[in-house]
UniProtKB/Swiss-Prot annotation:
Species of provenance: Pseudomonas fluorescens (strain SBW25)
Record-given protein name: Leucyl/phenylalanyl-tRNA--protein transferase
TM ranges: none
Chief location: cytoplasm
Function: Functions in the N-end rule pathway of protein degradation where it conjugates Leu, Phe and, less efficiently, Met from aminoacyl-tRNAs to the N-termini of proteins containing an N-terminal arginine or lysine.
Taxon lineage: Bacteria, Pseudomonadati, Pseudomonadota, Gammaproteobacteria, Pseudomonadales
């Protein structure tokens, strides 16, 4: 039976209670307050729902992740990186990045990044938890991504690209920086071909929970929340 969250409690059910079908559905309801979102990521779940649906919380098994030292750089991406084809910045325009991620895609009917999601993650950005990566081409924003940093873990949320390999360029740059800062894992949530091309692989929910337990409260050497 699906658990419905109460607005006056930040408690989530155990991850083992998540449904097998649909894979990982853990709970519904609650709200998108910064406090609840922070607790959700610490617990091992994330919000994902469409316009008109209740807030749905997920913890899929297996979980798609990238270990920074396993980042795969294709020949074409490596060439762009060597040429420094684009300029990459962090936290320079979070609002523009999340708005671009929310824009309609040719391969999808709608977006899960509703206005309420945008507002919630902007609040997390203002608190220092959510971060953006911007990819620029001669001053024009052509790609980027956003996610949350906690301890030695980065939780990726969404990315966009308006130019050849721009989002991969930004992701590769971020991954190298995260590794230098002592991050050990990037949570990618759900699998897709784009992520697999960058080296993503699946780990069990229990293994993912172990990374949360061991690394959420460990310091990183970067400027982000630790």
């Amino acid at each position: 039976m699906l658990t419905w969250l109460q607005r006056d409690s930040l408690t989530f059910p155990p991850l083992a209670k998540a449904m097998r079908e649909p894979n990982g559905l853990l709970a519904a309801g609650g709200d998108l307050s910064a406090e609840r979102l922070i607790q959700a990521y610490r617990h091992g779940c994330f919000p994902w729902f469409s316009q008109g649906q209740p807030i749905l919380w997920w913890s899929p098994d297996p979980r798609t992740v990238i270990f920074p030292d396993e980042l795969h750089i294709s020949r074409s991406l490596g060439k762009l990186l060597r040429q420094q084809r684009y300029t990459v910045t962090f936290d320079q325009d979070f609002a523009a990045v999340i708005q671009a991620c929310a824009a309609p895609r040719a391969y999808a009917d709608g977006t899960w990044i509703t206005q309420s999601i945008q507002n919630a993650y902007l609040a997390l950005h203002q608190r220092g938890y959510a971060h953006s990566v911007e990819v620029w081409d001669n001053g024009e924003l052509v790609g980027g991504l956003y996610g949350l940093a906690m301890g030695q873990l980065f939780f990726g949320e969404s990315m966009f690209s308006r130019a050849d390999n721009a989002s991969k360029f930004g992701f590769a740059t971020l991954t190298r920086q995260l590794q230098a800062w002592g991050f050990v894992l990037i949570d990618c949530q759900m699998p897709n071909d784009h992520l697999h091309s960058l080296g993503a692989r699946a780990i069990s929910r229990s293994d993912f929970a172990g990374f949360l337990r061991d690394h959420l409260d460990q310091p990183n050497t970067g400027p982000w929340v630790s």
